[in-house]
Amino acid sequence: MIRKILNKVAGFFALGWLAATPSLAVNKGDLPALPLTELHKIDSVVGDGETAKRGASVTVHYSGWLYDPSKPQGKGTKFDSSKDRGQTFQFGLGRGMVIQGWDQGVEGMKVGGNRTLIIPPDLGYGSRGAGGVIPPNATLLFDVELINVE
């Protein structure tokens, strides 16, 4: 009887550990439906370095797509990538230098971490869009790698 109880308790702990483990990929069935109303953060790698905090200067690599839940991993048309250019991007976290979805989504990452951000229009470029590349009211998907925190 005690052995059965201990096995059940161990099973619950294992389920809790699995639930706390970040997914390594965004599965099509797990993608949020449109219209998106909140920021989604999915850690594929949790770094082990310094944590990105508001006010810090952070350096990242990123790739950005128009979010399309009908496409693999929700990645529609790619519109930008620091990786493709071979140049990192540095900005002041929480200082309004980037879209709100980035300020909120990068905060809390650890150096060495990789995070997917699915950003609703109101935390992105909203009704104005951007540069003829991002249409008005677009939901965005970014893969972000945190390189450094100063």
Sequence positions of predicted segments:
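Cross-family detector of peptidyl-prolyl cis-trans isomerase
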Residues: I2-E150
